[in-house]
Amino acid sequence: MSKKLYIKTYGCQMNVYDSVKMQDLLYPFGYEPTENIEDADVIILITCHIREKAAEKTYSELGRIKKLQDTRKKQGLNSAIIVVAGCVAQAEGEEIFSRAPYVDIVVGPQSYYNLPELISKVVRHEKHLIDLDFVEEAKFDNLPEQLYPQGASSFISVQEGCDKFCTFCVVPYTRGAEFSRNVEQVYREALKVVSSGAKEITLLGQNVNAYHGKGPDDKIFTLADLLGHLAQIPNLERLRYMTSHPIDMTDDLIKLHGTEPKLMPFLHLPVQSGSNKILKAMNRKHDRDYYFDIINRLRETRPDIVLSSDFIVGFPGETDEDFEDTLDLVRRVKYGQCYSFKYSPRPGTPGATRTDQVPEHIKSERLTILQQELTAQQLAFNESCVGSIMKVLFDRNGKFDDQIIGKTPYMQSVYIQNPNKSLLGKITDVKITKAASNSLTGEVI
C-alpha cells in the first residue's frame, strides 16, 4: 500500500519547482502525492521568509496541523511526519522546534535530497532532525529527473542564491551564494519536460540573469547562451526566465530578446524603488537612469516587450519626495503588471537595524496609492488587447467545469469556454473579447 505525501508551498516559483522535485524524490520510496492533508503520512511545508507575514503563515499552518495530529491521536491513528522546508527552515533552524516541538524535520533548500534518509530516521523514532547544509552542487547533483509531468508549462531551476546583498533581503542568508547548474543538467531536464508535453519552460533563479554555468569543454555559458541552446529543442515553443536583477541585464541577453522568437516578449525586472536615495540605501547597485536605459534598450530591441516589476514602499528613510520618485518611474515605464509590498524588516538584514523606520500607517497609505496606479496601468494594457488575436497556451482548468485558462505571451490569464477540455496543453489563436484588471476573456477562432 502506498504512503501519502502532502506538500503545501508558499512563496516564489523556486519553491514551486522544489515541491515537484520533492515528489519525484520521494516517489521511489512509496510516497504518492495527495491533495488531502488528512490522508497524509508525510506533511511538508515549503516556506517563504521574504516578509514577516509570509514567515508567520508557517506557524499558523503548523498550528492547524497540530490540531489534525491531536484528532488522529484521539482516533488511534498514526501521526503524520511533519517537515518544515524552505527559507523559514534555513533562517530559523532550531527555533522552529522551540515554537512547534511536534515538527519532526527541519530542512534547508540545499538539503532536500536528504529527505528520504531523514524521513526514514523519523520512522525509526528519531526526532527533531535538522539539515541546513549549504552545498549547492550536492543539491542539483542528487535531485532526481522528472517523474511527475508538470503540464504544458514547466519550471526549471538553473541558478540559486544571490551575491547582491540588498539591505532589505534575506535571500543571500537563506539560499546562499550564487550558484549555477551546468548546461548538460539543464538541457537534459528540458528535454524530459518537453517529451512529457511541456510547450513552455521558465528558467528560474533568485538572480537568474547572473547565470554562468559550465557547458561543453568547460565553456562558461551566460543566460543568453543557455536560452539560445534550449531554443533548439524541437517542440519547445516558449521560453521565459525570472527573476532578474537590472545590473545583470547584459548586452547579449538584451539582444536575444530581438533575435530569438521562442523568447517571450515579457520580462519581470524588479526595480524596488524609483528614488536614487532609496536605491542606494537598498544597495541595489544602480540608479533610476541606469534602469531607464535598460528599459529603452529592451524596447528598441523588441518593441512589443511588456514589463513587470516589484516595488517596496516604506523602506527606512523613504520620504514623500522619494515616494513621488517611485510614482514618477512607474508612470514613465508603464508596466503591464507589477507586485508591490510594504517594507517588512527581516532579522539579520541591515535594513532592519535602521532607526529611521517609516510608520506603518504611512507605508499603508503609500502602498494604496501605488497599487491604484499599477492597477490602472494593468487594466489599460489589458483593455488595449481587446479585439486582438493572441496565441494562448492553455495550461490549467478554470473554476467552472466548462472553463479552461491559458496565458498570452505577456503572461495575461485568458479564460475561455471549452467544455471537453480539448485545448488543454495546446497553443491556440484566441480573439480577446473582454478585459479586467487581472484577466482577459476570449473566444477561440
UniProtKB/Swiss-Prot annotation:
Keyword terms, alphabetized: 4Fe-4S, Cytoplasm, Iron, Iron-sulfur, Metal-binding, S-adenosyl-L-methionine, Transferase, tRNA processing
Residues reported in the UniProt entry to bind [4Fe-4S] cluster 1: 12, 48, 87
Source domain of life: Bacteria
UniProt keyword annotation of Cytoplasm present: yes
Transmembrane segments: none
Cofactor binding summary note: Binds 2 [4Fe-4S] clusters. One cluster is coordinated with 3 cysteines and an exchangeable S-adenosyl-L-methionine.
Domain TRAM: residue ranges: 383-445
E.C. designation(s): 2.8.4.3
Assembly and binders: Monomer.
PANTHER family: CDK5 REGULATORY SUBUNIT-ASSOCIATED PROTEIN 1, MITOCHONDRIAL TRNA METHYLTHIOTRANSFERASE CDK5RAP1
NCBIfam families found in the cross-reference section: miaB-methiolase (TIGR01574), MiaB/RimO family radical SAM methylthiotransferase (TIGR00089)
Designated name of the protein: tRNA-2-methylthio-N(6)-dimethylallyladenosine synthase
